[in-house]
Amino acid sequence: MSMAQVVEACKLHAVFAKLGYLFRARVCLDIALANLKQLRQRVAIPQVANMLAKKEAQCCLLREKLNTQIDNRSLIKLYKIA
């Protein structure tokens, strides 16, 4: 539960999204959002709370885009002909 974990989760999201591992990227964003929410609850300084809220909004937008990519993806089904 630190800002370093949030940054690392966001970097992993970018790597996984670039490689096409969309579900893993979504898990990384979920981790980042959970950490941001916990950090925002513990911070008493208004400027830091505003920064965390902006970062949380940015992660939410990334998650919406990722969910759209997952929904638009066409699945390839392989059938075994016996």
Swiss-Prot record:
InterPro entries: DUF5475 (IPR020123). This is Uncharacterized 9.3 kDa protein. It comes from Orgyia pseudotsugata multicapsid polyhedrosis virus.
